Amino acid sequence: MQIILLDKVVNLGNLGDVVKVKDGYARNFLIPFGRARRATAAAIKEFEVKRAELEKAAAAKLAEMQVQGEKLGGTTVKLTQKAGVDGRLFGSVTNADIAQEVTKQGFAVSKSQIRLPNGPIKTVGDHAINIALHTDVVVDITVTVYGETA
């Protein structure tokens, strides 16, 4: 299916690109989430009329996320979990736990934006993680996990 991208999509293209994707990807993800439209002649003409407005909105969103990224970058998040004497956690710290704690600190972050390079955190100590605020804005923060013995 040919589609017009209304937003930058990772590994696919930028705003305004006409790309061919599988029908299911377009129908079930890109179009319902407002990231793309079918590439009909009428849709292409309509997009060209709105192109400057969409680019301006995308640039404003990027600038806003860069400002938030500068504030959030280098932040340390402290979590306490039950752990054994050897420093291994009973369970793990997931991206949902981290997103909840970052949100408590005043930053609007969803769990889908948290990137755990080594999977869920299962040990006590400092761990470096990434937060993807925007496709072009990824910040590094430190998660410190303290063990709590029962």
From Swiss-Prot:
InterPro entries documented for this protein: Ribosomal_bL9 (IPR000244), Ribosomal_bL9/RNase_H1_N (IPR009027), Ribosomal_bL9_bac/chp (IPR020594), Ribosomal_bL9_C (IPR020069), Ribosomal_bL9_C_sf (IPR036791), Ribosomal_bL9_N (IPR020070), Ribosomal_bL9_N_sf (IPR036935)
Biological processes per GO annotation: translation
NCBIfam families the record matches: L9
Signal sequence bounds: none
Gene3D superfamilies named in the record: Ribosomal protein L9, C-terminal domain, Ribosomal protein L9, N-terminal domain
Family as reported in the entry's similarity comment: Belongs to the bacterial ribosomal protein bL9 family.
PANTHER family, A to Z: 50S RIBOSOMAL PROTEIN L9
GO cellular component: ribonucleoprotein complex; ribosome
Keywords for this protein: Ribonucleoprotein, Ribosomal protein, RNA-binding, rRNA-binding
Domain of life according to the entry: Bacteria
Keyword rRNA-binding included in the entry's annotation: yes
Annotated SUPFAM superfamilies: L9 N-domain-like, Ribosomal protein L9 C-domain
Keyword rRNA-binding appears in the UniProt entry: yes
Protein name as catalogued: Large ribosomal subunit protein bL9
Protein's job: Binds to the 23S rRNA.
GO MF annotations in UniProt: rRNA binding; structural constituent of ribosome
